[in-house]
Amino acid sequence: GPESSGKTTLFNELKTLSGFNFISEYSRTYIDKINRPYQYNDILEIAKFYVKEIETARINKRSLISDTDLLTLLIWCEYKYDKCHSFIKESLTKNPPDLYLVCSPNIPWEYDPQRENPNNRVELFDIYLKKINELGIDFEIIEGNNSKRLIQAKNILQNIHL
């Protein structure tokens, strides 16, 4: 889902589940590390990290829960720069996830210096749903307060990870 939609909060709560590999949001770490405003090509470097982590999870034959992924990077590139690296598009279509849990922006915006779109969350949410549908990937919308979101997500994951 879009910025400030509860992805990281939900991700951190799901890390208690066993049988999964977890990928934290690398974009924040990368942007903090470069010590300058990010640029278009930085998103490609972030994508390379995610692809490596996805490949590691596949080699280990473990299900993967990711705070953000290549879809987020694809939308980020297209929304901000009106273009996207072919590596991101190809990697996403080559190894699509089995399911997206898409966090609804129905919770209050929380300021963060790396966040850029406080007024565009519903628009971005719609873009996520459109892209996921275009890619033909299953998804579930996660909404409500944090405890409801966690219950929803755990129920979904338990049903597909029997």
Please state what every model-predicted region is.
Residues 44-95, 114:
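Glycine-rich phosphate-binding loop used to anchor ATP phosphates in small-molecule kinases
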Residues 16, 58, 133:
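Anion (oxyanion) recognition and catalysis
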Residues 81-148, 152-155, 161:
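A glycine- and Lys/Arg-enriched "phosphate-lid" helix/loop adjacent to the NTP-binding pocket
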